[in-house]
Every structure is written in C-alpha cells, then in structure tokens.
Regions:
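Structural recognition of short helix-loop-helix hairpins that underlie histone-fold modules
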Residues: 55-56, 258-262, 273-282
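Short amphipathic alpha-helical segments embedded in low-complexity Lys/Glu-rich regions
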Residues: 15, 67-70, 80-86, 113-116, ...
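Conserved ASCE/P-loop NTPase catalytic core
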Residues: 32, 36-39, 44-255, 369-383
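AAA+ P-loop ATPase catalytic core
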Residues: 66-73, 269-272, 290-302, 322
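Extended, charged/polar low-complexity intrinsically disordered regions
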Residues: 1-51
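The conserved phosphate-sensing helix
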Residues: 60-64, 183, 262-263, 284-299, ...
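C-terminal engagement/docking regions of AAA+ P-loop ATPases
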Residues: 94, 269, 278-290, 303-384
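Active-site-adjacent bridging/hinge elements
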Residues: 38-47, 264-275
C-alpha cells in the first residue's frame, strides 16, 4: 500500500484492554488523596512542581512553564505545541530538556536531519521514504530549541505543520503525496528582549498565534542567585513527592484517557473566548484557534487531575493560563490574573493561591456576563 500505516501506540491499546482503569503508582495515589479535600488546582500544581530536579530550577519557580509542559504532555491527537519566550531562558531550557525524558521518543532538533520525511533510495537503488525528525518523534516531543537558530525554510515548515496539524510525505514513483496527522508535540524557545526577538524572528507573531501554549518566562534575580548558591552544595538532597519514574508512568496513562466536557466548563471557555475577543477591539490578539486550545487545555488539566469529566474549575485553569500568557504578550489584562511568583513550594498550594484562583474565577464570570449582553447571537452560533 502507498504511504505509511498509522500504528496505534501501546498506551491507548493498554487503555482499551483495561477499560480506561488507571494503574497509578503509590506515590501518586497518596498525593491525590492528600489533595482531594483541598483546592481543585492543588494536585496538578504539585505535579508541575515535581518536573525536573532542584538542580534544573527551584521547585517553586517557573510554574507557568511547568504547567505548560504538563498540558503539552497530557494531550494526544492534535498536540499542544509549546513556545517559551524570555530574556534569560537558562533555567527554562534545563527544565525543558529534563521534561523531554517524560515522553516516548524524545527528540532534539538537528539541522543534519530533515524536519519531515524525504524521498530517498535504499542500497538497491529503490525509492523509499526516509523518516524526518517529526516522524522519529512520533508520540513524543520534538524540541526545536532556539527559533532564531533555525533556517527560514525550516521556520516556515514548522509554522505550516503546526497550523495544519499534519505532515506531508513526498510522492513515490507510483504513489501520490500523502498526509498524516502530526503526532509529535513541538517545543521551541525565543530568547532576548522583545526588540531582539522581533529582529531575529521576523514572524514571531505567527508563532505566537499558532503555538497553543505560549509562556513568557521570567525569573527574578534573587531566585536565580539563591538557586546558584544552593545548587552548588555537595550535600544538596532533593526529595520529590512524586519520583521522575512515577510521574512518567502517570502521564503515559492519563494522556490517552477520554475526557468529556461538562456544559458549565464548555460555557465558561466559550464565554471567555468571546469576551476576550470583544474586549480587545479587533480580536486579532485572540485568534480563532484560541477556543480549540482552551478546550484542549481544560481536557489536559482534567486528565492530570485524574478526572474523566472536565469541570468548570478545569476551564478556569485553562483561562487563567491563557490570560496570563496574553497579558504578558500584549501588556495588559482586563482580568488581572494573579502572577505566578512564589517564594516557596508551599505558596503554590497555600490559601493565598487558592483565594487568587477563586477571585480570578469570579472576575472571569463577571466579564463574561457583562460582555455577553453585547455579543451578537450569530457570533456565538459560529463557534458552537
């Protein structure tokens, strides 16, 4: 037959055989039970803090990036690509490289290998398809690194692949070109001031629009200094609540789990999407694809929280992530999302963080109600 046959990965086959029942590591079960009576965001936040080691980055720092990594890893089918922007991405880069090991087929981009499949000849001279890096990273992650270091042709190819959600295989002598869904998540970084990034990456706005998860990563100097001082200690011990192996097992099981969205969750996401577009004039800062991204983020948050149904709080987590990224990108927010800046791991799940998320939920609901009165019904029908 022409083209390549899509083989179902082992994890979804396991889901079918076990009827969706999870076989969770003991550390995950104990942590989930301990968090069950707390905030609906606590368990996922603690999981995010467990990414990497304390040598990569302080566990209380870069929470927005940590959540973005988890959201990307906890999706299947149309994957959530991740773009990290900042003036100093040393700690972010360490965290990304460490998180790569949580997925199958982790791949770091090399300019020596084609991005997608190319036509080649085998030793006998017969035509064949040579897998590119997107195919080799199937079911995993392709870490592109610095966008500024990529050739213009590769950047355009990346934009096309992410926007269409598919990779194209070249035509064989007797077979037409074929397409397959993109099965790898793409991670990339853009480092420098906004002026430098605009100069080095002419189409950075296009990348921000098509990459579902955009994180503006900034770490204050005091956090970096403390990290450098403490990480140099020879006797530094790291005792994560969930080991690296257990976290990998959890992600591998939950990302193929089917999640249904409750009406309240879908209504919140749709209302937030419409309100965000209307409150920003032309709406160009919030692309049409944003709603699909919000839905997938809510589903990913529900999976990570071990729920098979995405509830309203999962939608709030998705809206908060998106609004935080949008505020950093355009310089303002109508909702004033609480900043992810913590001085300790306890702050991530403390009462203040819980109250901040509850306040954001209320602000979000009020904005949706206010702007929904001025939203034409035709606009709602077009996206539902």
């Amino acid at each position: 037959m022409c083209g390549l046959e899509q083989v179902k990965p082992a994890a979804p086959r396991h889901q079918e055989l076990t009827n969706g029942q999870l076989q969770l590591p003991g550390s995950v079960v104990r942590l989930h039970q301990a968090c069950n009576s707390n905030s609906p965001y606590t368990f996922v936040r603690i999981l995010a803090s467990q990414l990497g080691s304390v040598l990569d980055a302080p566990r209380h720092a870069l929470l927005q990036l940590r959540l973005g990594i988890l959201f990307s890893l906890a999706t299947h089918g149309p994957r959530l690509p991740l773009l990290v922007i900042g003036t100093d991405l040393v700690l972010a880069h360490r965290l990304l490289r460490s998180a790569l090991q949580l997925c199958p087929n982790p791949t770091v981009y090399s300019h020596l290998i084609p991005l997608s499949a190319v036509l080649a000849r085998d030793t006998s001279g017969a035509h064949c398809l040579q897998a590119g890096q997107l195919q080799r990273a199937e079911d995993g992650v392709l870490y592109l690194g610095q966008l500024a270091a990529l050739k213009s042709s590769v950047k355009q190819q990346v934009l096309s692949v992410v926007e269409t959600g598919a990779t194209t295989f070249p035509a064989l002598p007797r077979c037409p070109p074929t397409q397959q869904p993109l099965a790898a998540a793409l991670w990339a970084t853009a480092e420098g001031s906004s002026t430098v990034i605009q100069k080095n990456i002419k189409d950075i706005e296009s990348f921000c629009n098509v990459f579902g998860l955009v994180v503006h990563s900034e770490v204050d100097d005091e956090t970096v200094m403390q990290h450098c001082l403490f990480s140099s200690y020879d006797d530094l011990h790291d005792s994560p609540k969930v080991s690296f192996e257990d976290l990998a097992r959890l992600i591998d099981q939950v990302r193929y789990r089917k999640v249904t969205l409750t009406e309240s969750c879908r209504s919140l996401l749709t209302g937030y999407f419409l309100a965000s577009r209307r409150s920003r004039g032309s709406g160009s800062e919030v692309p049409q694809t944003a709603l699909a991204t919000l839905l997938r983020m809510a589903e990913a948050h529900a999976r990570l929280a071990l729920r098979q149904e995405a509830v309203e709080e999962d939608g709030v987590a998705a809206c908060h992530f998106y609004e935080t990224s949008l505020a950093a990108q355009v310089g303002y927010s109508h909702l004033e999302p609480p900043a992810f800046s913590f001085s300790s791991l306890g702050d991530i799940v403390g009462d203040v963080a819980k109250e901040d998320m509850e306040m954001f939920h209320r602000y979000c609901s009020v904005m949706i109600i206010m702007l929904s009165k001025h939203t034409p019904s035709s606009e709602v029908l077009n996206i539902t």
